[in-house]
Design a protein with these regions (language model features):
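A short glycine-rich beta-alpha junction/loop motif
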Residues: 8, 12-22, 80-83
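Alpha-helical interface subdomain recognition
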Residues: 23, 30-33, 38-160, 164
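Single conserved hydrophobic/aromatic residue that forms the stacking wall/gate
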Residues: 1-6, 11, 158-169
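Residue-level marker of intrinsically disordered, low-complexity segments enriched
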Residues: 3-5, 11, 16, 33, ...
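Intrinsically disordered, low-complexity acidic/polar segments
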Residues: 22-25, 168
Length: 169
């Protein structure tokens, strides 16, 4: 059945009553997902690193905009909790970097299978936190944040949270 993912068309097939010869079964019956989890680790680390780069860009734009956008006669950096929002974004980016570094090191030292707990943790945490940071940057920009004048809306579209229930189980 066709589906639309982002701006690309994909095809999803489903099979009923399929028989797989015993010699073609990987790891054992019902363990196919397990082998894919082990092999997907490096790609997940890469995706998390790219997402953190988007959060870094959003923070950069947020800091710049908070000093130039004026409301009630003051830069918005001096209003409300905007400085706290910026500070929290910096802290969360640093925490994400350390968590991804820990996951990557675990893959190098322990191997992909044993590192899967670390990889699953960053795969669940990073996209969610990155979306929150990009959203905060959009809020600080006002309507400009969702326009084509900044990369923020596009970054948010391409940083979708993963199916966390799978990563956390």
């Amino acid at each position: 059945s066709p589906c639309l993912v982002g701006s690309e068309m994909c095809i999803r097939d489903s099979f009923n009553n399929v028989r797989v010869p015993k010699e073609n079964i990987l790891l054992g019956e019902g363990r196919g997902f397990e082998i894919s989890q082990v092999r997907l680790g490096p790609g997940r680390i890469h995706h998390c690193m790219r997402s953190i780069g988007k959060a870094e860009k959003a923070l950069e734009l947020m800091v710049k905009r908070s000093g130039t956008r004026v409301a009630f006669g003051k830069p918005i950096a001096k209003l409300g909790k905007n400085i706290e929002v910026i500070s929290r974004a910096r802290i969360e980016i640093n925490a994400m970097r350390l968590a991804v570094l820990q996951a990557a090191k675990a893959m190098d030292v322990l191997g992909n299978k044993e590192a899967r707990v670390y990889v699953s943790a960053v795969k669940a945490m990073v996209p969610e936190k990155v979306c929150e940071i990009i959203d905060a940057a959009i809020q600080m920009h006002g309507a400009t944040g969702i326009s084509q004048w900044t990369p923020l809306a596009t970054c948010l579209l391409y940083t979708s949270p993963s199916p966390r229930d799978t990563d956390l189980s």
